[in-house]
Regions:
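PRPP/pyrophosphate-binding module of the type I phosphoribosyltransferase fold
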Residues: 164
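Domain-scale signature associated with acetyltransferase and cell-envelope carbohydrate enzymes
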Residues: 1-161
Length: 164
């Protein structure tokens, strides 16, 4: 079942030059992502530190969108929803809860959105952050041992027609 378009980029390096070649390809339903009709994903990356246990979709992109950027799901509960006719220019989205972006939204290059503080405000809880991350990386699963229970988080909602 075809659900959208994605641009793949190949970079060729010649001494003194860097040439980016973009190729339009089709995106099939995979990795818990639903993409609406006529949307283009360019320089698009999804990182799931922990996949949803029930395998349900966690990212929804509406129709007629142009989306670039990196989307990081730090735990199994995060969901990102993007409305129709939305542009995201190379941003970073880090989600443990919920990020909702309305329709007809324009987000400029280099914006970062986090629905969490990434680290607890309590020093006693942060003491293990580095060792927990290192342990997960050594096992090939970054974030596996991160304790999100004491990290403050709240949903982000960008309403229709916002411009950032």
């Amino acid at each position: 079942m075809l659900i959208g378009n994605i641009f793949n980029k190949m970079r060729i390096k010649i001494p003194g030059f860097i040439i980016d070649i973009h190729r339009l390809s089709k995106l099939e339903k995979s990795d818990n992502i639903i993409v609406g009709n006529n949307s283009i994903l360019s320089d698009f990356k999804v990182i799931e530190r922990k996949k949803k246990a029930d395998g349900t979709n966690r990212m929804f992109i509406g129709s007629d969108c142009l989306i670039s950027g990196k989307f990081v799901f730090e735990n199994e509960n995060g969901t990102i929803k993007i409305g129709n006719s939305t542009f995201i220019g190379g941003g970073m989205f880090i989600c443990i809860d919920n990020i909702t972006i309305g329709s007809n939204v324009l987000i400029s290059w280099g914006c970062t959105f986090m629905d969490n503080d990434a680290h607890s405000l309590l020093a006693s809880v942060r003491l293990n952050d580095v060792s927990d991350w290192k342990r997960g990386i050594e096992e090939g699963n970054p974030g596996k041992y991160k304790n999100w229970e004491k990290v403050a988080h709240a949903p982000i909602i960008l309403k229709d027609n916002a411009w950032i």
